[in-house]
Amino acid sequence: MFVLPPGYQDYPDLDLYAYIYRYDYLDRLVYKKLPGCAPSYLVYDAAHRLVFSQDGCQRNDSLWPFFVYDVYGRVVVEGECSNSDKHVRTAGETVVLGTLMEGDTGLAYSGYQSSSDLVDPCVYVVNYYDTYDFRTRNGFSAYNFPEGTVSAIGNLTGSILCTHGSSGFIYSADYYDINKRIVKSLSSRVNGGMDTYATEYSFQGSPLSVLHTHTDSSGYSLTERYTYTYDHSSRLTRVSHQYDNNPSVLLLEHAYDELGRLQTDKLDNGIYATDYAYNIRNWLTSIEGSKFSQSLHYTDGLGVPCYNGNISSMVWKSGEDDIMRGYHFTYDNLNRLTNAVYGEGSVLVQNQNRFNEQVTGYDKMSNILGIKRSGQTSSTGYGLIDDLAMSYNGNQLKSVSDRATNSVYGNGFDFKDGVNKEAEYEYDENGNMTKDLNKKILNIQYNCLNLPSRIEFENGHVISYLYDADGIKLRTTHIIGSDTTVTDYCGNVIYENGIPVKLLTEAGYVTLADSKYHYFVQDHLGNNRVVVDQSGNVEEVNHYYPFGGLLSSSVSNAVQPYKYNGKELDRKNGLDWYDYGARMYDAALGRWHAVDPMSEKYYSWSPYTYCMGNPINHIDPDGNTVVIWYNNDAGKKVSYSYSGGDITHPNSFVQSVITAYQYNKANGLKAGNGGGASTVAIVENTNIKVNVMEAVFENSYNPNAARGAGSIYWKSNWGSQKDNGIVNSPATVFDHEADHALEHKTNTQEYEVNRARGSDSQYQTKEERRVITGSEQKTSRANGETRSGQVTRRNHNGKTVITKGVTSNVIDRQKTQEYEKRNKAVWTSEP
């Protein structure tokens, strides 16, 4: 199967633009090729589970990633091996199982034995379930993990993660209460220490306190405690923090309006307060504080009115000065930013154009073709600092030329045109950038997670990274000339050259040398605009270009590294990269350096495009693209951001969303038909944010809810019975609503047109026809709720029924009857 994006229409090159898929006789995906990348191979066992895979970079090294399952179908071991292609292909003839043996035997001495012969296996992940017998195994015994006192049947109890870039491992264990909530977690650290988290819950499952103890191999220890308070609606109202023997600090205090929207934030016992205002559509319109204020305009203000949620203009004031700064914005018909015109004063007519940022064009894949950027050129002068022309090989950047003759003054951002060659950038078989001659980068090496492990510069300087097998950054090492700086990330404790220097908090950080608190004051995108100390004094002021570059007028912006979107900025040796966790971002070019892991949900967009060309309205929150709202023990509505992974959450609604994601993803991979893809996309994609709330009336998606961010309303035991008798589980219903959310986020204009009532005589709307005939059929089939050739329905009718669980399509007759008595069940348009 071929998917040909818009770029193919102008340049019909399958290798550069096409998405290519091949399936076996069981309709399982066995071959996948992304644009500009080498193909990936997938191999399944007789139980239709993925047991081997291989991308282009792994093929160069003759490596095959492998997956071993237990008898319950849970992944117990992941790693890479050197099996021959012929041997790997025979895996489909058997069911690959991992058996837990006694003692330090098997794969990486984990105790697991695989029924498949693995040649030179290198283990990356080991998972233990149900019991704590692993405590005495190799590696765990050194950390004195305690025995569990409550049954953990069905739960992940322990894990081993390798550290990519070293020979070490991270050992961890989770302990549960009788309600299957994690009450204690222990994890070893890369510096030889240990982190322990102990959580106390309210009756409703909300955390009341979290006690964190951190130690390292030198004997240093730190203890901190968070205490949480909620109002009658279970909304978080107070967060207190204490570390070591220091006095407790009221870190955060929240107040809400009558609609449940955040109205006021206070920091550090009220030394700094921020007020928020909204319009009738719940879109944020202003942030007001003494050190930072911002007004956002949509249909009013100085720019061209935008009625679709785009911000037409914004004005802000930061720090101690009284200068009003701002931009008015212009967008094209695809909601991509084309021009940001800077000005000062209340109507932005003073000092105009000083910091403009203009995108001079996009290609059909939304790759930026050119950028004009103005900035400060001397102590008193301003002018054009970048006039970029960008050329591509498919979606991959080939070269950049800068026609501007001015350079930026001070500490601002601009593009450094280091060379003038036909090919200034190179990429590997997975689409990762391996060379940037303009930054004098000769080589970038990547690990098997497509995360950078080593950057080598022309002058001999080196930056290296250490990650665990989940992709969490553990260490950064900068070798700049004769100076070496090692930064260790031990949870929220930051070390530099072995010395603990910072303790990150929910509102900023503590400098450990003087025990002082520092707070981030943020704008609507989570950009850190101002840093204030515990007395409310301004320590840092940051002003940003729309795509994230720092303006030269920023003040003391080297105080701390967390800037745009709250992400860590590395400026050493001219790197100027933001670390978003899954990928690195270059704000001077408005591009990523690696392929979007969810690019297959955005065929019309380049996998390197940042925020779909709209950095004013969209953010990349570390992949935490699903924000799940729930009521905690105090009845307060709080949120939990989830980006995937095998996580157990104490709140039952949050856990049900996680279960739906895991179920849809696993069955979609097993079926190889694209089932569950919408659920996976909204959870894992780095460019979108979707809220999930517990339904009261019906399962649905509302694009105007949650300040215009959109919200899925869903209940974990509400399935859907069609008029032909077919029942879809709540998990399948969730994917239906996720597809609506995904279309709203990625194809807004068409979504708004197609969801008009009456636009389709059979399915009520064209949008419902698209979802019902597409993702609903795939997910229902993948989840075993419909057979091959069978359809869920041929209309938009459906009746809510109570099922026996998130993943069940078996109707609970008694509860359904009770529900129907209360609600007078009717055939509705949702789900």
Model-derived segments and spans:
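Short turn/helix-capping motifs enriched in Asx and small/polar residues
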Residues: 111-113, 535-552, 573-575, 581-583, ...
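A motif-centric feature for acidic-aromatic and gly/ser/thr-rich catalytic loops and repeats
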Residues: 2-3, 8, 203, 293-300, ...
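Beta-turn initiation residues at beta-strand->coil junctions
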Residues: 2-8, 25, 31-37, 46, ...
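Active-site scaffold of zinc-dependent metalloenzymes
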Residues: 691-731, 741-745
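Short alpha-helical catalytic segment bearing the HExxH-like zincin motif
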Residues: 580-583, 726-738
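Active-site or metal-binding loop neighborhoods of secreted/extracellular toxin and effector enzymes
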Residues: 749-831
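Aromatic-rich beta-strand edge motifs centered on tyrosine
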Residues: 15-28, 40-49, 65-74, 89-107, ...
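Catalytic Zn2+-binding segment of zinc metalloproteases
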Residues: 737-753
